[in-house]
């Protein structure tokens, strides 16, 4: 009888092609997602050595990082470097015969939203992409993580990856979340507790009642930020919600193949008695709506708190806090709810799905953004955008004073026209608040979609619970 195994153990074991004496493994890769920034050199490497893509049917390409989110982008991209990268992806996808969703295709969007949406991401798979937030796909019980450009070329050429196994970490969220608290608050709270290095060397399995109660969109948000906690990947065991989400999607199995897949997927859970190397437990009812105050995702506090002082920290974190406060232009003791906001960004692979837009629209319905507020919603894919328009969400955003954009990574990172100006302060539903992440000297506060919508209305960081069920302004 075999020893009890974790979910990570099972997926890993099913994909090991060869193991060396030192523990280094050759791992088979089921899905390879590609975007325009980390792939040009990899494809050029294939050309120089006369190699083909080994499994073009398992390789999916989408331009997302560099693409503008305004009309006319399918014919003209002003930034030369961005244009060259998008054109290179277009040529490489066609030359090598891989699956491709160009900007002119309604299915185009952020690669980590397109993969699940199209049924490319399935439970039990290994999924890689030259992108940090590949862990998103772990919400399906897939082993998914980012890889470097040289590894992108290796996977394109061989459909395998050289890896050493990580350790097992369990993050359990017990009980239920309170009203106004979301998946984004879970994942930020975990990072706030463990720090950005807390998951280093581990693959995290998220579990517990609060995780089970999340939708698939919410689970993707949680796994998306596993990398921000230092982990190699984040996983959630598949269940009936997972199967219902996948069923009927364009590239999901059909007929007898579906039944066979389902039988396998139902074995993908951590066995009773399986050992984890590290365990973190948080009570769901203790999690509040949170916001980041500094320049690291671990700089997290409940919205009801005040800006900390450097003296509140120890060791090297004292100087880091001092630098963060200076960069962010904040004063110790200042209420977080007194921090004025210039810009609101709702979107990204963390919070650009239909559920995220619904949550923001619920807060914004019948209201207007604060005077002088710059606010934009960037759906995670063309299909999310179309659905939001069909549901009337787009009109709510437009009526409130938001810009309604085309799909892309947008203001999550300063690689396209959507950027902050120096000193501009943004409430953002994205995943990183590093210095300059959204534009040179821009200031980022990470929040949930509802919290972002609340800040747009009031003009400052706001507890979304104060606006929930609040009456709309008279017409």
Swiss-Prot record:
Alphabetized UniProt keyword annotations: 4Fe-4S, Amino-acid biosynthesis, Branched-chain amino acid biosynthesis, Iron, Iron-sulfur, Leucine biosynthesis, Lyase, Metal-binding
UniProt keyword annotation of Metal-binding present: yes
Chemical reaction(s) catalysed: (2R,3S)-3-isopropylmalate = (2S)-2-isopropylmalate
GO molecular function, one term: 3-isopropylmalate dehydratase activity
Cofactor annotation comment: Binds 1 [4Fe-4S] cluster per subunit.
GO biological process: L-leucine biosynthetic process
Subunit details: Heterodimer of LeuC and LeuD.
Protein family per UniProt: Belongs to the aconitase/IPM isomerase family. LeuC type 1 subfamily.
Name listed for the protein in its UniProt record: 3-isopropylmalate dehydratase large subunit
